[in-house]
């Protein structure tokens, strides 16, 4: 039976760092002395939890286990109040160099495997067909082109190959060409429709014909009309003659050639490449729908507003950083960045399956 000794009669251990045996069981981990321990107090270089795994009933001591290295905070003595904390060294969290090699920054090649290219599947197909010698490719050749030029698509091939098949069959700008008798093989060829200008929009190919709202915006940007009427009523002889005199070539559409040439400029490191027409037109030459912010009638003008609003606020000259009046101009450089810029992004609405 343990006898109780009053505190006044018990021996005092003043500065030797010697505690009672019962206190030493818990003081190493959870008790911080008020004074700096003397050199006589010996501390283990590292706590080996393997010694306590089979002798104690504490369910938390087996967490690190004998096979794992101790935490860096346990390799030193108890942290005392007011003393600076020690930081993890250059060797890393594991203690030895190379223990956390997976935490190193990825290389450029590894980064390309992680980041998805900012092109839709239809744009990838167009680039593959345009790079072919005869401007036509089979389905397997399109797969091979995408996998060779974009490392991101080397994994999970079943998903993106299915999306490419859907884009080939649903987009009107891709045409299926049967094989000749002199060219035996499996699968048909795919080529680009020469009249795919209506399907081309900001580096992507729409699945079907443009909506009416998009056609109106295109008329305001390009400054001509009558294109939609020619599509809706092809029986009109005047419209058909106008379509016959259109500058669209039988080889490739001008907008498509512009886009694919700019893809080559981006690959060669050119920074002066602009977006396809009508986006290549300077913003100062485009008509901005400023009537939206006026009265209810777009033709009505209010003199008191014209005198109050400065001329520089309604100008459509872009800033140096790429920001312009995107609220007044739907084709501003903020919504459609330059292809040579690092933040190349395209809107993906309706551009892929």
Swiss-Prot record:
Compositionally biased intervals (Basic and acidic residues): 213-222
Organism the protein comes from: Danio rerio (Zebrafish)
Motif Nuclear localization signal: where in chain: 206-212
Family matches, as CDD domains: FH_FOXI1
Protein name, per record: Forkhead box protein I3-A
GO cellular component, one term: nucleus
Record function comment: Transcription factor required for epithelial cell differentiation. Involved in specification of skin ionocytes from epidermal precursors.
Expression sites (tissue/organ): Expressed in ionocyte precursors.
Compartments it resides in: Nucleus
């Amino acid at each position: 039976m343990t006898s109780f000794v009053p505190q006044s009669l018990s021996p005092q251990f003043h500065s030797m760092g010697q505690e009672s045996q019962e206190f030493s069981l818990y003081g190493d981990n959870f008790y911080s002395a008020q004074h700096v321990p003397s050199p006589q107090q010996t501390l283990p270089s590292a706590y080996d939890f393997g010694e306590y795994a089979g002798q104690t009933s504490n369910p938390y001591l087996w967490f690190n286990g004998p096979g794992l290295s101790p935490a860096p905070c346990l390799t030193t003595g108890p942290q005392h109040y007011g003393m600076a904390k020690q930081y993890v060294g250059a060797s890393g969290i594991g203690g030895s160099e190379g223990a956390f090699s997976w935490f190193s920054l990825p290389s450029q090649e590894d980064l390309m495997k992680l980041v998805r290219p900012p092109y839709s599947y239809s744009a990838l197909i167009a680039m593959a067909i345009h790079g072919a010698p005869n401007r036509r490719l089979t389905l397997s050749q399109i797969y091979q082109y995408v996998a060779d030029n974009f490392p991101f698509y080397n994994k999970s091939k079943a998903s993106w190959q299915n999306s490419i098949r859907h884009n080939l069959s649903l987009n009107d700008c891709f045409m299926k060409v049967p094989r000749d008798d002199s060219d035996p093989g499996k699968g048909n060829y795919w080529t680009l429709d020469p009249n795919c200008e209506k399907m081309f929009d900001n580096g992507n190919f729409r699945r079907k014909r443009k909506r009416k709202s998009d056609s109106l915006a295109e008329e305001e940007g390009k400054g001509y009309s009558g294109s939609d009427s020619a599509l809706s009523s092809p029986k009109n002889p005047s419209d058909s003659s106008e379509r016959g005199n259109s500058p669209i070539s039988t080889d490739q559409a001008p907008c498509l050639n512009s886009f694919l040439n700019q893809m080559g400029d981006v690959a060669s490191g050119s920074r002066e490449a602009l977006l396809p027409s009508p986006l290549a037109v300077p913003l100062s030459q485009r008509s901005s729908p400023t009537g939206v912010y006026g009265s209810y009638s777009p033709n009505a003008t209010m003199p008191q507003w014209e005198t109050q609003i400065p001329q520089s606020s309604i100008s459509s000259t872009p800033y140096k950083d790429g920001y312009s009046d995107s609220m007044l101009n739907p084709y501003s450089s903020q919504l459609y960045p330059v292809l040579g810029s690092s933040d190349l992004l395209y809107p993906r609405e309706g551009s892929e399956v």
